[in-house]
Curated annotation (Swiss-Prot):
Its cofactor is Ni(2+). Transcriptional regulator. Pfam families: NikR_C (PF08753), RHH_1 (PF01402). This is Putative nickel-responsive regulator. Keywords: DNA-binding, Metal-binding, Nickel, Transcription, Transcription regulation. Coiled coil: none annotated. One of its GO terms (molecular function) is nickel cation binding. Ni(2+) binds at residues 78, 89, 91, 97. Binds 1 nickel ion per subunit. The keyword Transcription regulation applies. PANTHER family: NICKEL-RESPONSIVE REGULATOR (PTHR34719:SF2). InterPro entries: Acetolactate_synth/TF_NikR_C, ACT-like_dom_sf, Arc_rbn_hlx_hlx, CopG, CopG/NikR_regulator, Ni_resp_reg_NikR, Ribbon_hlx_hlx, TF_NikR_Ni-bd_C. CDD domains: RHH_NikR_HicB-like.
Length: 138
């Protein structure tokens, strides 16, 4: 894998802000920060396309005392056995549980799974975090 050097013209004020941020985040140089931005751009594009193979996590916080929420969560997860790779269940306190579902598949299908899980009555908060499978990144 070769490395290509290229130039970018941007306003000075924008570059100064960028330099401050990459220093705060601990980047050793602009190149690595720009590579990360490009990788993120590629991953987001893969998700937008909808038919790309992607991965992600669906995190849900819910009250297990809420009527039928546990049964509905499990039933829905069993509807997507091909896409759900694993799940982690954590008891936050005597009523609240945190569940992280690890998913892999077509972006459109993963979004569908997240929408269905996160919209269940009893799910207090949730989020889909998207990434790629790694094959599309260098």
């Amino acid at each position: 894998m070769g490395v290509v050097r290229f130039g970018v013209s941007i306003p000075e004020e924008l570059l100064e802000k960028f330099d401050r941020i990459i220093e705060e985040k601990g980047y050793v140089n602009r190149s690595e920060a720009i590579r990360d931005l490009i990788r993120d751009f590629i991953v987001r594009h893969e998700w937008e396309v909808g038919d790309a193979e992607v991965a992600g996590t669906i995190t849900m916080l819910y009250n297990h005392d809420e009527a039928d929420v546990v049964k509905e969560l499990l039933d829905l997860q069993h509807d997507y056995l091909d896409e759900i790779v694993s799940s982690i269940h954590v008891h936050m306190d005597e009523h609240n549980c945190l569940e992280v579902v690890i998913v892999k598949g077509k972006a459109k299908r993963i979004k569908e799974i997240a929408d269905r899980l996160l919209s269940l009555k009893g799910v207090k908060h949730g989020k889909l975090v998207m990434t790629g499978t790694g094959r599309e990144l260098v």
